[in-house]
Amino acid sequence: MDIEKINKFSTKISETYSSELSRAKSSICIFLLGCYCKVHKPVLMRLRKQVVDKKVACLIAGDLNVKEIDDTELPDYSKKFELICNLILNSYRRPVPFIYIPITKAECGDGAKIELVTLCENPKYEKLKENIILFTEDIDTVPHQHKHLKNPHIGAKDEDDFLAKALGRVKTEINIMSDILTRDEENNHEQNRKAFKPENPEGW
């Protein structure tokens, strides 16, 4: 993904939407974090494709191409991670970071754990930290920083289970945003208390 495509996430949303569901989808951005080894990066990319197919903005940290960083002998990926976090924070969309921490395998690093620690320990990322959804295959392997998160972790048995549960959580986030948008615009409090019902539950 090039920088022009990424920049659209920071563009003010001014379109007219056909339904509250469409508007809700356009008001959030899923930010996928995790291990980027040869085993797990394809898992994140599969999830991103499925999320984008649902008309929801979705990024992985590797989307940002920065020549000054990528072309060096030892790329500073922590700097790239900071840049994309800042991009998300400056977006008009509500950021929803998903972190997938799989059981570490021989060929894997601890990228997802490092990202979690970075987000939790940097005060600048308080807004992101509040919205993090943590998916873990083994909670005992997660650094203690996860205790600072407001959301409980979601157990994932393996990659396929993570994909299924992450997509389910995307649906939940769409419902939450739709409810927020409805409350903002409706004066009838009784109407606001009604649960959001997607007009097309099968297709959401």
What kind of feature is each model-predicted range?
Residues 1-204:
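Conserved catalytic or regulatory cores that recognize and/or transform ribose-phosphate-containing ligands
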